[in-house]
Amino acid sequence: MKRLVAIILAAVSLGATAQTSAQFKEKFDRQVRSVGAAGVGVEYILDKWASAYPEDTDMLEGRFNYYLAKSRSEEVQKVDAEKYLGQKPVLSLKDTLGKKVNYFTVPVFNDSLFRISQKSIDKAIELAPNALVYRFDKIGALAVYEKDSPDMAATAMLDLIDYDAAKHPAWMFNGEPVSREDFEAAVQEYCYMFYRTGSPNSYESFRILSERMLKENPKSTLFLNNLGAYWQVARRDDKKAAKYYKKVLKLAPGDETATANMKIIEKNKSKKK
């Protein structure tokens, strides 16, 4: 009888102290707001949360963010460019020959910690394949990690587009359904990120993703404008760029982007005469 009472009391005690997943998330979010994504006490909460709910996708995203932040630091590096990763230099000096030398703030990563972050978000994607937020978490992290050569990020985005085209999943983002327009707009955000980076490799990723999206929607003025921008800015080929802008204007005569860029092309053409 005493043993039975002890078991009952232990069960009652456990029920009173056990935390729900929502309570762990609330405590985690509060700690992050207080000390930052990789601050003191964050890992302790994540470990307790993971022990109680090892397949909680919110916990896995939390671990992803923790290890991503833990892996990242910044350095000031000399780069032979006027812009790097879409940013202006934080410092410009002259060398002994009078040549301008630019210094930029550049993200650097601890590879082993970064791999842990990727493993965590991969598990979240496996458990919730229709949750776009986890896929975008992964792609965004890869893009920052790779800096001016976003090959893995572009491949991950292409895989996402292919998966969307083949499976037509009912995408969700933070619990809300994602429309076709929302999906295309989200892809465009990453296209713009590659465009803004402004390196030869990132421009190619910008082109490849835009062309892939046009296979699914050949009349998308969004991605037709992208290809116009690619040829106009990355390749300096106004003639080829104009072909895409003219396609846009046939589909949407009032399109502001195509109209503005055609004016620039016409202005450049008149200067050459």
Regions found by a protein language model. Give the residues of each.
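Helix-start (N-cap) detector for alpha-helical repeat units in TPR-like alpha-solenoids
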Residues: 21-24, 57-58, 132-133, 168, ...
